[in-house]
């Protein structure tokens, strides 16, 4: 009886480890090969879109798209959450947004001070779009931006072309509200989290 339970428990553990390996495999092939985006933006609920990034570290193959690049569409325009890891990745996201809606991007929100959230800022600023981030995220990017940029250039090589450091143009401490007529977006700082200046957007 005990032997059978041991075999069953071992079988369950092996099955769980196989499932975990499949779900968390860092070598999942690029899901959107004709774009610098790792995956194509999907509308999860009405007006809320996200291009889900790779689950592994940033590489040349995933163009540094290892976070979620999201956007909210409205009659007033589009709000983007996360600028992308480079100018080329930001442009790839913008190209997809233009296929979905004929409205301008009116704001980009950096969810924190990490490279994949902020290094695409220069592209958006060149388009005339204001960039919002928490004050701690801006300080993180001010202090460590050159190293963050150099790391990205190291793995992204030619895909880093045109990317330069560009700080957010709007900062906030606790809460920032974006009123889009029939839609209100709140950027909230809820305290220390994954990295300096991490915020929630809802």
Positions of predicted regions on the chain:
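Bacterial N-terminal signal peptides that target proteins for export
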Residues: 1-9
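Bacterial N-terminal signal peptides
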Residues: 9-17
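Bacterial Sec-dependent signal peptides at the C-terminal "C-region" and cleavage site
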Residues: 16-34
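Beta-strand-turn-beta hairpins that frame and shape the catalytic cleft
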Residues: 43-48, 75-78, 177-186
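Conserved beta-strand hairpin/beta-sheet module of binuclear metal-dependent hydrolase folds
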Residues: 46-96, 199-202
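Short catalytic-loop micro-motif centered on adjacent basic/acidic residues
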Residues: 79-83, 106-110, 186-187
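Active-site HxH/HxHxD metal-binding segment of metal-dependent hydrolases
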Residues: 90, 95-170, 177, 198
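Core dinuclear metal-dependent hydrolase active-site scaffold
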Residues: 173-202
């Amino acid at each position: 009886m005990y032997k059978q339970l041991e075999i069953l428990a071992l079988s369950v553990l092996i099955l769980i480890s196989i499932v975990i390996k499949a779900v968390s495999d860092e070598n999942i092939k690029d899901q959107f090969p004709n774009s610098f985006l790792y995956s194509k933006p999907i509308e999860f609920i009405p007006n809320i879109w996200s291009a889900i990034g790779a689950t592994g570290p940033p590489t040349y193959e995933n163009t540094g798209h290892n976070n979620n690049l999201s956007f909210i569409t409205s009659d007033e325009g589009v709000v983007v959450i996360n600028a992308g890891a480079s100018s080329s990745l930001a442009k790839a996201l913008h190209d997809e947004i233009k296929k979905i809606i004929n409205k301008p991007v009116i704001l980009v929100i950096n969810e924190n001070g990490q490279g994949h959230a902020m290094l695409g800022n220069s592209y958006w600023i060149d388009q005339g779009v204001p960039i919002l981030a928490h004050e701690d995220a801006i300080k993180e990017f001010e202090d460590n931006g050159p190293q963050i940029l150099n790391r990205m250039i190291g793995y992204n090589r030619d895909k880093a072309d045109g990317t330069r450091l560009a700080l957010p143009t709007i900062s906030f401490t606790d809460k920032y509200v974006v009123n889009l007529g029939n839609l209100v977006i709140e950027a909230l700082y809820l305290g220390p989290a994954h990295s300096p200046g991490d915020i929630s957007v809802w």
